[in-house]
Amino acid sequence: YLPSGIASITDRVAARHWGKALAIHELAPNTAFLLAPLMVEAALGVVEWRTGLMVLGFAALALAGIFKWRGWGADYCGEIPDRRVMAAIAAKPAAWLMMLSFGIGISGTLGLYSMLPLFLVSDHGMERQWANSLLAFSRVGSLAAAGFGGWAADRFGPRTTIRVVFLLSGLLIMGLGVLRGPGLIAAVFCQPVLAVCFFPAGFSLLSRISSRRSQNITIAVTIPMAFLIGGGIVPLFLGWMGDAGEFGRAIMLIGLATTLASSATLGLPGPEVDTPEGIA
């Protein structure tokens, strides 16, 4: 979905408003983080899990029909992933930096989200229900924060926004590893609010590093690899360190990596790259 979805938004919206438009787009995953567990818990009291999956599938089909009927998309066809296009993308340092940046961004949201309940229960002695509820409600603030992140990307530039988000989010992640009591709870609530501000700026910048026609391939290559890093390797690392009794230290290392990644943004394209045609 993402290659076509992001390309459709950036094609129909002026480049100076990409941050705000993509922030609206990012309301969807942030809302899902909050509502999906609550909806599943409520549905399981009425129907079995297979019925829930069927409803989800029918909803996806219905939305496809609605989009075909009333939706709009880009008025051009993207590139096919042939050797020429892939080589051109691989030759861009900015593409590799964006892959790393999205990996860091995803590790600060999905990666931590999947492992924090275990950390709170095993290292801080919280009840499982309390830990899950705390984590769910900590995502409420991220709904408004995504909009702020989009505004900041348009106002100060996506590169500056990403740098500040990584710096502050990394410090809060390190706080998760060392704080206890009220300080820990404050960090649990504040860190995701900052972390989600990355994505409007990240997608805005990712859409600028290649031509309009090859934008779909750039996104299709970058995001899966970033998910492998942030949603695969990082949770695996946290689990492995948790088994060794070093859960807190592992979270501190993730926070340190996030903070250091703020300096890597110096290699990303700056605000002068502001047209849909990108830099290649």
Predicted segments, located by residue:
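Extracytoplasmic gate region of multi-pass secondary transporters
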Residues: A94-L143
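Juxtamembrane intracellular "pre-TM" segments in multi-pass secondary transporters
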Residues: W72-M98
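C-terminal transmembrane helical hairpin of 12-TM major facilitator-type secondary transporters
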Residues: R159-G202
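A late C-terminal transmembrane helix in Major Facilitator Superfamily
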Residues: R212-A244
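C-terminal membrane-cytosol helix-exit motif in multi-pass small-molecule transporters
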Residues: F58-Y76, A264-L268
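Helix-to-loop junctions at the C-terminal end of transmembrane segments
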Residues: A146-G157, G242
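Helix-loop-helix hairpin linking two adjacent transmembrane segments in secondary transporters
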Residues: H25-K68
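Cytoplasmic helix-loop-helix junction between adjacent transmembrane helices
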Residues: Y1-L27
